[in-house]
Structures are given as structure tokens and as C-alpha cells.
């Protein structure tokens, strides 16, 4: 696809918080600059002990209260490559407040509610009816506030979450195309964008059927990657916008195969305990009532 930038994966530690798993995934991605994603202040503190390399990104999602935002800003002051993703205006105000107090020019991202919906069991976590993220009009208000604070160049990332365990590749194509158009528009408005975060959703073919069912997916990993890269490049080339780094948060696909649960079958229930004969027993059945009329 001749894409003119790189790809990074970030591992959401909420997928599996076991220390051995997180450390192994983080170590395996060292040569590729892979990072970690956190959804709370405690997770951020855990990740801080791992990310000694300033080039490994930390993406901060989830609801962010005052203490969470303050921890993020202090991590920035230590030189960590940390990007809080803004999901409401309160988070933006807290970030601007603490950044001013500590003399930090913060890097930040915005999570966008797309009109494109996911599919399957977690479809409500994406789309414009999702409880997370900002509508397009709200994103424009964030841009306006950052511009007033002379921090528009600090808007580095655009993020969306389509859904989890996406079994239909068409949903991915639609969402990525829409997100790329939003990225291009924000770039044209003067934002200092560098990253496009497509969130999670990469499925796992649990039953091996390669079908459009909740426990499977109708695409391969190669097809997923090709479609994502092609759609982003195609949109941005048409808008004459530089290619960003692509980030994904495919925690399920990264960790699902690391272990298998094996257990003994203790019992089973059957449905054919009681049998009904096909022919009823010979009993005296009610006879039809016939009415006769006579010509008198």
C-alpha cells in the first residue's frame, strides 16, 4: 500500500492484568515500539514502572477524575510519552488546569463517536449512541478551546472504538474510512495530529468457522491490516494530508491464545428422558355430532 508511516500496537492491560502476561507482551513488542493502554490511575501507576523508554507510548482512556489527570500530567513532566484521550469537557478543563500548574504543554487526543456502528455482542460500545466519546460538534468545541489556549498543536491523536470481537470486516472498513475523514478535517483546522488510533475490535476465530458469528470472524489478520492501511491512505491521499502513525488496541487478539482452560465434565443433561409414542393409545374418542334435517 506504500504507506508512508509506521504502525504501533498498544496493549490494554485490562485484557489481562497478570504481571507475567503484561511484561511478556511489552517485552515482545520492544523492537516495534509497542506501548500500553490504561483505563484508570492504578493501571497508569503499574505501567509507569514498565515504560522506562520514552519512545514507548502510554494511551490513557477511561473516565478521568482530578487525581487521574494530575498523575498523567506528572508523568508528562517526567518525560514519558503519554497521551490522555479526552472523552468529555470536564477532562479537558482538568488537563488544562494541571498542565498550567506544572508548566507542561500536554499531548492529548480525542475520542470520537462515529456514526458507523460495530456488530455483535458489543455493538453498543461504538457508534453515535455510545456513552463514551465526543460528537463531532463537541470535537470542534475542543478544537476551539485548545486554539484559545494556544494549545491546538498539542492535539496529537484521534481515537475511536468500533466495538469488541468484530466479526464482519465491512464494519471495520466503514468506521476506518469515517475516522480518516475526521482526521483529515482536524488536520486542516490546524491540529498537530500525528496518530490515528482505530481502537480495538480485531476478532478471534474461537470456533474456527471463519464466519460472521459472535464466536468467529469472516476475515484474516492480513485482510484486516490491508483494509485498514488502504482505507486510511486512500482518504488522506485524496485530501493531501500526511500519513499518521496507525495505532490499534487489539488486546483480545494479542492475549487470547496465551492460555487454555481445561476442565473435567462433571455431568450432562439430556432432552430425551421422556418419550412420547408416535401413535396414541386406542381409547374411545369423542364422536362427531351430526345434525339431520327432515323435509316435512
For each predicted feature, which ranges?
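Catalytic or ion-translocation cores adjacent to nucleophile or general acid/base/metal-coordination motifs
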Residues: 243, 269, 273-281
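Charged, amphipathic alpha-helical linkers/stalks
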Residues: 286-288
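Conserved small/polar residues in nucleotide/adenosyl-binding loops
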Residues: 292-296
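A glycine-rich phosphate-binding loop feature that marks nucleotide/adenosyl-phosphate handling sites
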Residues: 159-161, 195-203, 243-258
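Active-site-proximal beta-alpha core segment in soluble small-molecule metabolic enzymes
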Residues: 8-195, 204, 219-223, 231
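Short glycine/threonine-rich loop-to-helix capping motif typified by GTGT followed
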Residues: 166-174, 205-223, 253-268
